[in-house]
Amino acid sequence: DVYKRQQLILDLSMKEVCDYIIESISKILESANISYVKWDMNRNMTEVGSLELTSERQRETAHRYILGLYRVMEEITSRFPNVLFESCSGGGGRFDPGILYYMPQTWTSDDTDAIERLKIQFGTSMVYPPISMGCHVSAVPNHQANRITPLETRGVSAMAGNFGYELDITKLSEEEKEELKEQISLYKEIRETVQFGTLYRLKSPFNSNEVAWMMVSEDKNEVVVSYVRQWALVNESFSNLKLTALDKDSEYEIIGEDTILSGDELMYIGLNIPELYGDYVSKLWKLKKKDL
């Protein structure tokens, strides 16, 4: 179906087309107090060609299209420096340094299921930093996987990047709204470490029933550790989660647990993973380095 969603692609290899888009979008942004724009990309390029080019130059079209797109983005983001623009990887596959130059964050995937996102975000983080990955809590049952994942785990999964929500809050219970408040408060506490710290992958979802990662703040004083178990196992043995990149001679306080462990203990013995019941369960720890 070349008419995806009844959409066609404008020929951005043509200057007049770029001029039209720049002015049209600028008028909209000037018409209201707009602070955030999601720049979606959902149409594949098919039957690529341009009326602007001769027959022997038609193979230049895709390249010139991207140059035109960069020009559009350069002009619009320069005109509106206080607007946060978010690009989209779903459909257009444009999660790349070229787009990130103009739009500092990208919607990591149109797949918003929290469990599917574990692999998506884990893989994306191999190339792009967490601050650039749009990661949102979505409604359940998930509209794609039809999976019901606990709100806590949806939150932990989304806090692996640029955190937000992708749901209708008017349909949430009062209890869920309170949990959202707690999640937002928590993310504000850990945001600097998540977005500007160093990411370490502890367990991969590609070869394990578990996934875990940790972020260490720039000053090495704060640590955020996230853990998700995908499916429950009968008679599963107790296990620890070994951390990395800590100061072995320093002590770390586990916030909220009244526990202090040395860096040596955390790296060679690990954090005790508590008893977790059911599928799609999670745990997030905050650690703070203590002054000696």
Indicate residue ranges for each PLM-predicted region.
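Short, small-residue-biased leader/transition segments that mark boundaries at the very start
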Residues: V2-Y3
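Alpha-helix capping and helix-loop boundary segments enriched in small/acidic/polar residues
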Residues: L8-L12, E16, E56-L67, A145
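An active-site-proximal structural segment forming one wall of the substrate-binding cleft
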Residues: M14-D40
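Short loop/turn motifs at secondary-structure junctions
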Residues: A32-S35, R79, L84, V281
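Short acidic/histidine-rich active-site segments
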Residues: S35-E47, S87-F95
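Conserved N-terminal phosphate-binding loop of PLP-dependent enzymes in the Aspartate aminotransferase
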Residues: G49-E52
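Active-site-proximal substrate-binding groove within the catalytic cores of carbohydrate-active enzymes
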Residues: Y70-D258, E275-Y277
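C-terminal beta-strand-rich structural cap/linker in extracellular carbohydrate-active enzymes
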Residues: L261-L292
